[in-house]
Structure formats: C-alpha cells, structure tokens
C-alpha cells in the first residue's frame, strides 16, 4: 500500500529564493508544454517527449530529469482533466433530463480548456534529482542554483514511513512554508480473521455512529462551517485583495479542522474494530451529491460540505494497516429498516434522531439502528462471496 509522508523543510531566506525560482521555472515550462499539447492535440507522455524534449531542454536551462518530470506532469494533468470532463458532461446530461421533465431549460454542457499551472504549484522529484538522508534528517534537492542540502522536521510516524520511501516526492510551497511529500510503499499486513462486522453509519449531525453504540458528533464542525459561511458572505461583498486573503485563510482553517476531526474519528473506529475482532462495513455513498437536487437549499449545502469520502478513505487505509477488512454495502433504506424485525417503512424514522418501528415497536437512536443494518449487510455480503 502506498502512503504519503509529509516533512517540513527548514530553509534560509536564500534557499527559499532558490526553491521559488525552481518552482517558477518548472511551472512556466509546464504551461508552455500544455499550450503546445492543446494546440497540437498531443497528450501522451511519450508523444510529447518525442516531439518537444530536445528543444525545451535547450531553451529552458533545466536539467534533463526536471524536463522529463514536467512533461509527465502535463501528460498526467490532461489524463485527469479528460476523465473529469467526461464525468462532468455525464452529470450535466443527467441533470438536463431531470430539468426537461420539470419543464426547465437545459444547462450548457461544460467546455474543456487547456490545462494551466500555478507559478508556485508543486513539482515532482525522483531519485535522480532528490536524495533522502533519513538518519540525518536531511535531503539533497536540485534547484536552478545547484544542489541544496536541507534539513527537515517530521513526526515519528513519518520517520518510520520514510524508511520505505520509493519513487517520487513532491516539493510543495504552502502558506510561506516548504514541504516534501514522499511516496512510501508500506507492506500490507495479512487480513485478520474476524468475528462479524462493525457497521458504521455516516451522517451530518452525527458524523459517524457504529453498531456498538459509539457516536461522533459533527455539531462543532457544522457550527464552524456556518460561521465561516456567514463570514465569507460578508467578505465577498467587499471584494478587496485583503478580503480574498481572509477568505482563503478561513477556508484553509475549516479544511484543517475537518481533516483533523476525520483522522481522530477514523482512528477510534479502527481501534473499536480491532478490539472487538470485527471487520468494518460502511455505506457506498458514491453519487449521493447528484441525488439531492430536489432537496431544500440548506440540506443541499450541508451535503455539499459533508466530507464523508475523506472519512471513509481514512478508515479504509488505517484499517488496512491493522489488517482489518473493510466492506462497502448498499446504502438505500438503512435508516428506514428496523434492525430488530427487518420491517422497512418511511414512517419508522420519526425524526433525525428517533427510530420507532411501527410493526414490532422497537425503539432506538436512528443512526445506531442504521449502523446495525449496515453491519448485517456486511455479513450478507461476506456470505454471498463465500
């Protein structure tokens, strides 16, 4: 399994200038290559390299391997852009079908444009232009001003990851600080023998609830989002450069808190699964944002800001590191089905938090009931596979 180890570089002002020049030169080359690729409709890495390598190598003044990495960055960007554009077109076409049924005019289909790269966007280094000295907590990085030996700082977990560092590392400039993001190949432990499933129901009010009764509230996260939303609305009216910077700062703060919260929730979920010797079952929520167009605006906003995919990703990789199997099960009607008798009816869900089966009288928290149903679906999925 591949994981990312992030380390912070400790640089002097002079070294920061050298790194900045390197980013700017590399991204300027990427923009030139991107324009050529778009104009000539050539998007494959090998095709771009064959046609442009020698000329841009002579004109740019960059080392051979940096030019190769820039070509790869452009090719990969177009590959991703074409995939996203295709998905965007499909979503728009589905939306237009729904709008036609309601008698609404169709939305315009998205138009793809040439890929553009920020002056200080990250660039990838491989072993030819970057060397790690983990024991010394030092890296040797190629720049336009020559090789620089830079110390770095990181946590113990990142140090252990760096022992298995392989492949590329990205040089990233973020908020006036320099980071290296190293790809590390971690050996997957064998999957453990489990005794049942721990069902995990994800939500907005309660970010996660498991089938053992543990619940993780999203009240503070939602309050922060509302506060940021209100503040951003007032800043957007001003439209000044200072207001834009404040907007970006608020957005980053909200993102950091959400990521921190999801990390902690996922650690607790995996810990519960390990202690109870269970696999983890979660709902397959793919495409959920496309199915909420009929909901009121407030709920659409809440779902749009719901970071369920990040939380599921964190749970998946942390569970894999512990050898805990993870299964994704069908999501529909888990909140309306009674986990005691199996009766499914919308009237069972009395409110956001209350579940009362109208057939057998079973009463409990609605999220806990859904988590129990998800655990049962995990068992059914495993039985069908066996």
Please place each PLM-identified region on the residue numbering.
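Nucleic-acid substrate recognition interfaces
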Residues: 1-386
């Amino acid at each position: 399994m591949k994981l990312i180890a992030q380390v912070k570089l400790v640089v002097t002002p002079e070294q920061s200038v050298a790194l900045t020049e390197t980013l700017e030169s590399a991204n300027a080359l990427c923009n030139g290559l991107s324009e050529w690729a778009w104009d000539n409709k050539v998007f494959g890495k090998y095709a771009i390299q064959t046609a442009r390598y020698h000329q841009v190598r002579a004109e740019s003044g960059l080392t051979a391997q940096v030019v190769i990495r820039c070509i790869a960055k452009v090719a990969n960007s177009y590959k991703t852009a074409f995939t996203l554009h295709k998905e965007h077109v499909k979503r728009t076409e589905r939306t237009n079908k729904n709008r036609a049924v309601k008698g609404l005019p169709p939305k315009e289909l998205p138009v793809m444009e040439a890929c553009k790269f920020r002056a200080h966007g990250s660039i990838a280094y491989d072993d030819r232009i970057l060397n790690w000295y983990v024991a010394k907590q030092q890296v040797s990085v190629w720049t336009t001003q020559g090789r620089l030996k830079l110390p770095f700082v990181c946590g113990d977990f990142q140090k252990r990851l760096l022992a298995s560092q392989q492949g590329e590392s990205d040089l990233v400039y973020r908020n006036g600080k320099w980071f290296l993001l190293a790809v590390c190949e971690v050996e997957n432990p064998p999957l453990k023998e489990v005794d049942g499933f721990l069902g995990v129901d994800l939500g907005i009010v309660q970010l996660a609830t498991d089938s053992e009764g543990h619940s993780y509230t999203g009240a503070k996260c939602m309050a922060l989002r509302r506060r940021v939303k209100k503040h951003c609305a007032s800043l957007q009216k001003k439209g000044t450069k200072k207001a834009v910077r404040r907007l970006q700062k608020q957005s980053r703060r909200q993102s950091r808190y959400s990521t921190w919260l999801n990390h902690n929730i996922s650690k607790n979920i995996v810990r519960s699964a390990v202690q109870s010797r269970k696999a983890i079952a979660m709902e397959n929520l793919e495409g959920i944002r496309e199915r909420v167009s009929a909901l009121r605006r407030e709920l659409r906003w809440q779902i749009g800001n719901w970071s369920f995919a990040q939380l599921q990703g964190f749970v998946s990789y942390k569970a894999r590191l512990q050898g805990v199997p993870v299964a994704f099960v069908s999501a529909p009607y888990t909140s309306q089905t009674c986990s005691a008798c199996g009766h499914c009816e919308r009237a069972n869900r009395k409110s956001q938090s209350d579940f009362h089966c109208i057939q057998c009288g079973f009463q409990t928290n609605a999220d806990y009931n859904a988590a129990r149903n998800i655990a049962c679906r995990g068992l059914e999925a495993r039985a069908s596979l066996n």
